């Protein structure tokens, strides 16, 4: 059935909601990449099989056999605790669900309405039966992620049921293209891909170009290590992003659009394709959308995983079939982008904000966040923290609130050391900056960038020199090689960092690192190259004493840098079992059975096999 008007859309919404209400229970199995990796597909298959038996009247426990729906949702947020499951209408949130739990869930929850309490989340000693009871979830403000984990990620009907495509109907029915641009501009929405450029201003620049062939492009590449926000949106609610892109196309007069998504996101690609096909089937994409005479065709382009293709001009070059390399600007993509035509280029999260802005209004959007950065921001919260996962909070939220109130604090009570924000192009923030607001302008003042939204929390067991080396290794390998400052500068910086972590550094290396970092930052061709030295700049500024210890004292206080570690055996704890010696690949451990063993550090290759295999904590490390 093709939807040709707002009335058709509302009728479809009512029809689908009636179908959903007919279910006695709905089993929402998290089927995001994280939960699938921990076995969610088996959970889904088992629940579907068991619930089919219920509907097939093979269950004799009660006369009124329940009508049960089992659906695959997007990410439910608590990624570390997967596989996750929610049961409606009871609103139970189950964590760490295993296939063997499914029978009990059916028998107790679906048939009797009683919870399986051992599967509830626990916040210390507090049992949290419902999502709203869980601090990780109840302290978020979800706009972009509002449907993720709540609707079938592969059903456009369920998106329509929660109000999907009503913003598009409003735009097509009662707003001119300029009115759409004005509303987005008034909202203050800034691009969520890292730079924070005002979305409305970008759309306006494309709309006023003389060239009438225009494109709308979505950057779904998300190349930062540890970042999974955009991927989760594409997996869990691709329709919202597509609706936002369609509204953008109407606003700027584009008839074709491209979603650039990395090949390492196969689930995102699969669900995007399904979403596009379903939208075309319902007349919400393609020719004559909502019988308005407006055409917009959407295509998927799979990238090869190059980090540099997150940069606008490199991304458009890749779509064109060329090598993904940034070019000198101007002209910018709004003037000459894809195939030399004016192009709107925003990321997944930016487009996903648009439908809500159109429906609720720019003034509503500005009540959330800060004056200079309205709205919310999604973050992937990872590292040494109790609760890792996907979060969405108002702009201006402090790191302290995110780490301690939402994330539950650091693991095992370890002391906080720093948090890396913005991935390999970002910087490291420290204890004194925990109360700084997270918005584009405030973070920039701290020698970091918001980036796409990766937050890696680090404790006292993290070596900041190694962190800088890790990120520099990434950016150096991902450099496209076009400009000398980035190609050669990052290579030289990496050589120095590797020398320092190997205990071969000199004090003069620190001055050279700073000089190189400033050179790359000021002279690299593209934004990715200019931001590549930020992890080095921020760690040198805030943890210079650690660099000096590595050089002067040949010491790594976190006991992370392999070359600066020494393994020893405590004779008081060693029972002489010989297990360490058997597992030592270098033959560096000697001794007699039932007598304390000894490690020869001249032979030891510092692999740590002895420590890993000792059951009595007799092996210890000195830095």
Can you say where each PLM-predicted feature lies in the sequence?
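Ferredoxin-type iron-sulfur electron-transfer modules in oxidoreductases and energy-metabolism complexes
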Residues: 2-25, 41-70, 83, 88-121, ...
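Conserved phosphate/anionic-ligand binding catalytic regions in large, soluble enzymes, centered on
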Residues: 31-39, 80, 184-206, 305-317, ...
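Iron-sulfur cluster-binding cysteine motifs and their immediate structural context
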Residues: 81-87, 485-491, 579-598, 609-623
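Flexible inter-domain linker/hinge segments
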Residues: 120-186, 340, 346-361
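Hydrophobic alpha-helical positions that pack around
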Residues: 140, 269-395, 407
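Gly-rich Lys/Arg/Thr-decorated short loops/hinges at beta-loop-alpha junctions or inter-strand turns
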Residues: 150-166, 218-230, 333-338, 380-385, ...
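Short amphipathic, charge-patterned alpha-helical segments
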Residues: 244-246, 396-411
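C-terminal accessory/binding modules appended to enzymatic or scaffolding proteins
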Residues: 375-387, 393-395, 399, 557-601, ...
């Amino acid at each position: 059935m093709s939807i040709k008007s707002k009335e058709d859309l509302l009728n479809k919404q009512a029809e689908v909601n009636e179908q959903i209400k007919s279910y006695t229970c709905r089993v929402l199995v998290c089927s995001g990449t994280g939960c699938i990796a921990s076995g969610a597909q088996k959970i889904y298959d088992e629940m579907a099989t068991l619930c089919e038996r219920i509907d097939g009247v093979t269950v004799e426990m009660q006369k009124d056999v329940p009508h049960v729906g089992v659906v695959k949702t997007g990410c439910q947020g608590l990624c570390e605790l997967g596989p996750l499951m929610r049961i409606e209408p009871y609103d139970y949130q189950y964590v760490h669900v295993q296939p063997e739990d499914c029978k009990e869930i059916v028998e107790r929850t679906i048939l009797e309405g009683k919870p399986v309490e051992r599967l509830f989340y626990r916040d210390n000693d507090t049992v949290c039966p419902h999502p709203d009871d869980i601090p990780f979830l109840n302290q978020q403000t979800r706009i972009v992620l509002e449907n993720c984990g709540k609707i079938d990620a592969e059903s456009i009907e369920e998106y329509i049921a929660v109000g999907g495509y009503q913003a598009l109907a409003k735009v097509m029915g009662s707003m001119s293209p300029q009115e759409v641009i004005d509303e987005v501009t008034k909202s203050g929405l800034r691009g969520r891909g890292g730079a924070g450029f005002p979305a409305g201003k970008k759309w306006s620049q494309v709309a006023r170009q003389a060239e009438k062939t225009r494109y709308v492009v979505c950057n779904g590449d998300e190349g930062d290590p540890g970042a999974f926000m955009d991927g989760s949106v594409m997996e869990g609610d691709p329709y919202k992003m597509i609706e936002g892109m369609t509204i953008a196309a109407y606003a700027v007069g584009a008839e074709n659009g491209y979603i650039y998504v990395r090949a390492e996101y196969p689930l995102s690609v699969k669900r995007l394709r399904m979403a596009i096909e379903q939208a075309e089937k319902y007349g919400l994409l393609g020719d004559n959308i909502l019988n308005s005479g407006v055409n917009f065709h959407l295509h998927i382009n799979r990238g090869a995983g190059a980090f540099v293709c997150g940069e606008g001009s490199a991304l458009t070059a890749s779509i064109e079939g060329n090598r993904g390399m940034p070019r000198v600007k101007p002209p910018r993509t709004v003037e000459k982008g894809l195939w030399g035509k004016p192009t709107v280029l925003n990321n997944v999260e930016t487009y996903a904000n648009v439908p809500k802005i159109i429906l609720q209004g720019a003034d509503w959007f500005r009540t959330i966040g800060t004056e200079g950065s309205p709205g919310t921001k999604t973050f992937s919260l990872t590292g040494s923290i109790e609760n890792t996962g996907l979060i969405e909070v108002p702009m201006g939220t402090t790191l302290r609130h995110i780490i301690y109130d939402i994330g539950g604090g650091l693991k095992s009570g370890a002391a906080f050391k720093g948090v890396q924000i913005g991935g390999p192009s970002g910087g490291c923030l420290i204890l004194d900056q925990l109360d700084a607001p997270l918005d584009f302008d405030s973070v920039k003042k701290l020698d970091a960038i918001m980036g796409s939204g990766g937050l890696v929390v680090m404790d006292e067991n993290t070596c900041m020199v190694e962190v800088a080396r890790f990120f520099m290794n990434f950016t150096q390998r991902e450099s496209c090689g076009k400009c000398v400052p980035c190609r050669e500068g990052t290579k030289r910086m990496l050589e120095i960092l590797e020398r320092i972590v190997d205990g071969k550094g000199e004090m003069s290396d620190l001055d050279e690192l700073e000089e190189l970092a400033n050179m790359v930052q000021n002279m690299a061709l593209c934004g990715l190259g200019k931001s590549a030295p930020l992890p080095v700049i921020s760690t040198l500024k805030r943890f210079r004493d650690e660099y000096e210890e590595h050089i002067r004292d040949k010491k790594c206080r976190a006991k992370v840098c392999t070359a600066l570690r020494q393994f020893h055996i405590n004779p008081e704890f060693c029972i002489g079992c010989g297990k360490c010696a058997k597992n030592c690949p270098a033959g560096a451990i000697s001794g007699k059975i039932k007598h304390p063993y000894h490690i020869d550090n001249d032979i030891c290759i510092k692999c740590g096999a002895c420590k890993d295999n000792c059951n009595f904590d007799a092996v210890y490390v000195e830095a």
